[in-house]
């Protein structure tokens, strides 16, 4: 045992909770909660039957809780530093708009000529109009939480639910295959209804519709199954990693 090492504060709390003398864990080369959770619960109990006895399971559980809390705090601090650093860099590199815009300032009357006619009522002053319509608050919050992780919602579900056939192989299908594709699209539920609405046209030949609205002369929707083609013709941006085909026939737009 290295006598220069001392028990970590988190492990000291575990010692207090299970009522063992301070420094007991260090005698058995456990200096932090991470030394304990490197072993499975069963391994730890079996390896230390002689001294904590029946309290070994409780000691491992407490150590695991402390370790998880420390990991969460570490990740939160990392993310906070990353976001603050990006914001500070943006502010440092920004221009002084108050001085550079002299002579080109647009007054409020020009920018919002409707303000003079608005009534001071709750709807007028408190109504919030999202910049992205249709807007789905829960989906937007999920996307924001994953913004700095470079991981999609589909990736998270696929790692935790490997029983879904779609995640095992693209050639396999099942009840959840369509749901897996919806997760991969990064579109909110309301946005997903736009390209998947059924065709309500009574015309048998839709060539003129596709040429007028999407700029391609085609009798059916098949050219637009490729997401890049669909996005290019609509002049919209493909999300990062969105290079896969749409994959199902409901992609034809409603008319």
Swiss-Prot record:
Keyword Ubl conjugation appears in the UniProt entry: no
InterPro entries membership: Insecticidal_toxin/plasmid_vir, Sal_SpvA
Record carries keyword Endoplasmic reticulum: no
Coiled coil: none
Keywords, alphabetical: Plasmid, Virulence
Biological role stated in the UniProt entry: Not known. This protein is involved in the virulence of salmonellas.
NCBIfam families associated with the record: PRK15212.1 (NF011759)
Family as reported in the entry's similarity comment: Belongs to the SpvA family.
Name the record gives this protein: 28.1 kDa virulence protein
Phylogenetic lineage: Bacteria, Pseudomonadati, Pseudomonadota, Gammaproteobacteria, Enterobacterales
Name of the gene this protein is made from: spvA
